[in-house]
């Protein structure tokens, strides 16, 4: 088995930037984009709307579109992308070993760019109403039919909280912004925007202490510093209260700080283990910006290239750049109808295809519910399509846009995006919320195929 020069684990701004620089240095990097521990391919920018502070985009750019452009640039310079799942990392021997979807990859150098995941409040009632009114991603779940014209709440006082509060006014009103202090931590521009929005009500010096309701969230309880309490009747509660670094894969191997962030040399990407570098939010507890993550990815790649050269480990692969695929000019989605439905197609779109395959096809049917602004949906769909391609026609898939077909989503009990439902013989066999490992979907379908319908 050939040993890789450099493997990058993680595909946010840090991971893609590291890959771009490493590829331009002819290091032939391998970037593992798949479901990272606690994160999603593309990083946190996949769960944002307009990014307005990334240089070069004076009118702003959608987070998922920015990551598409980063991916295209990495591919242009020869980065090899592995859309698989990093399951384990072993730094105890050289070359380092990474287990990916059951196979082992060996590498001389490693850049860890696994990012961070959203924090929870751990409220009484939180587990019961998670995905039934409580969410950590307004951009993913805001279009859920149950939130239409309902009162909603966002917890937090930073840029993300303010952005999500303003974004949610597209769907519900009023939107209550719950801030635990007497001021916002957000940038001045974002703070001014949320204060000026008449559909946003700010509650200062308040904590959410309980969530309650029936089958769906109906209310939250706020508490003031003096112990006074107030009940807010809301159908949705969205968390924007910071993040925890995704470091489980290297716990006990790399030095971490008290909050779990990877410790590196001051101002540099090197970790305590030679040949291992960290970039982006996994090692940044202070700045946590897309542009700083990209900069740290650049640093990590340059440091890795120098380290490999110094130890005479680099095997250079000369490769000219290729023309990048156009990004931002996606083809319009064709919704299946009676005129264009192909009953043998692996992937189709719309409720007509769903009804037809649900009633007529004997094969397992994956139904994925998405929304236009859902970054994780953007990540998940290629993984599901890959599963169906591997199965070579033994299963099929349908995509439903919950904004365009909200009635279908409501009938299906969909409470956020992405949601995936697996059917066979008109029976719901399994359901998932959020991005999961590709192998999990494959195993579920394999289990159905192993048992006669």
PLM features: residue spans?
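Thiol-based oxidoreductase modules, predominantly thioredoxin-like and allied folds used
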Residues: 369, 388, 392-407
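Non-catalytic, surface beta->alpha helical segment in thiol-disulfide oxidoreductase systems
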Residues: 421-453
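Typically the conserved alpha-helix immediately C-terminal to a functionally engaged Cys/Sec
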Residues: 378-391
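FAD-site-proximal beta/loop scaffold in flavoenzymes
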Residues: 3, 122, 128-146, 240-287, ...
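Beta1-alpha1 glycine-rich phosphate/pyrophosphate-binding loop at the start
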Residues: 4-77, 160-188, 257
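A short beta-strand-turn-helix
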Residues: 346-364
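A Rossmann-like FAD-binding core segment of flavoenzymes
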Residues: 74-92, 98, 105, 170-266, ...
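A conserved FAD-binding loop/helix module that cradles the flavin
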Residues: 20, 162-164, 279-320
